[in-house]
Amino acid sequence: MTPRLPQPAQARIPHLEILDDSPDGARIVELYAGAVGSGRTRTLRLLGRKHAARIIHTLLGYEVQSSYRRIQCPDLVTARYLRLFSELGFRSIRLPYDPTVTARVIPELEAAVENLESRVRALFPRDPRLGAYVLRRVYAILRRRIRALPA
């Protein structure tokens, strides 16, 4: 095993500027605010850390599994909504009671998150670990912005 040489001093990565330069960051916050601000909502608790989530089809509907936690969902649209916010690392989210609101907003949310991910990863093509680190920091800023929305 070769010893690691000390890295030269590098400039700080401007996470906030990366998020602000992307139109998708503001779009995610705007879509979430539009979805939860348009009617009655309920609050669901999620895992609270960024973790890969998957949707499981069961006899009674769907479940979103993130790490050890499983959340029952009545339909696929709700499951996609919960999976997206579980993967972003939210502790809790507001879910509209009206599934048509969720169905209208989820494709745009998924596309915005995908665009944001590809944009950040394109900034660091030679170092995927650094890209993943920057993406985690950008998600943390997004979580703070969404938490700051009025209830």
Show the residue positions of the predicted features.
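Positively charged, low-complexity intrinsically disordered regions
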Residues: 5, 58, 71, 81-84, ...
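Short aromatic-glycine-(Arg/Gly/Cys) micro-motifs in beta-strand/loop hairpins
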Residues: 40-69
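Mixed-charge (acidic/basic) macromolecular-recognition segments
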Residues: 88-150
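Negatively charged, low-complexity tracts enriched in Asp/Glu with abundant Ser/Thr
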Residues: 2-45, 142-144
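A short, charged, amphipathic alpha-helix used as a generic interaction element across diverse proteins
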Residues: 40, 65-67, 72-94
